[in-house]
Amino acid sequence: LRAELGVIPPGDLRMALAALCDDSQWGRTWSDVMQHRFSIKTHPDEGLDNHALGNLLIVTLWELLGDPVEGLRWAGALLGARGQVLPMSCLPLVIEGDVSPGSNPTQECPPEKITRTVTGQSRLAKEADVCNVRLSPADAPACPEAVTAIEEAAWVVLGPGSWHTSVLPHLLLSELRDAICRSPAKRLVTLNLSRDSETLSMGSVSYTHLRAHE
């Protein structure tokens, strides 16, 4: 959807909306609807196969309303979501990272140790030994509503989620990073209960390098 329609990635936003549905029949049903993925029996891996319905709904609202923030607000109202979901930026971004087998996740990779560069969220999420993650364009503006929400928050919680492709990107946008650093809110890093491809080489101590951003 992102490549074909030029929109910001809806996947993490869909997951957040589904998680904010309340524990009622309405909320549980809509959470399941948002997370439902089509399974095409005749021609798998084509068309809508494995596409989440929630992504289609979100992108439809974006096209109709012309505003990612407003589209997410309408989606939240439809679902009865408790809370507001905001994008980190309203500009489509590309994420890429360098792969360096055996690298220390708390240190920058020396250029001579980098074996390849992986571009795209879905591809990068399958890699281990990732370092030097970056966004393009690097100077993209943050969503103003997201900056305001951080400034007014009592708690800023990072995670759980895919470490390199869902959590760290928020610290790569300068406006969001600065808002987190100057916020009087308490900060909490929530680790995943199980490791995925991105964090196979990381122990819990590896996450403490986030303090370098303070």
Regions found by a protein language model. Name each.
Residues 2-128:
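Electropositive, gly/pro-rich neighborhoods at or near active sites that engage anionic ligands
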Residues 208-214:
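Conserved small/polar residues in nucleotide/adenosyl-binding loops
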Residues 183-187:
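A short helix->loop->beta-strand "cap" motif at the edges of active sites that frequently abuts
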Residues 153:
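An anion/phosphate-binding loop that grips the pyrophosphate of nucleotide cofactors and donors
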Residues 194-207:
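Active-site beta-alpha connecting loops in nucleotide-dependent enzymes
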Residues 132-147, 172:
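Active-site glycine-rich loop that binds ribose-phosphate moieties when present
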Residues 164-172:
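Glycine/threonine-rich flexible loop motifs
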Residues 189-191:
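Structural beta-sheet core signal
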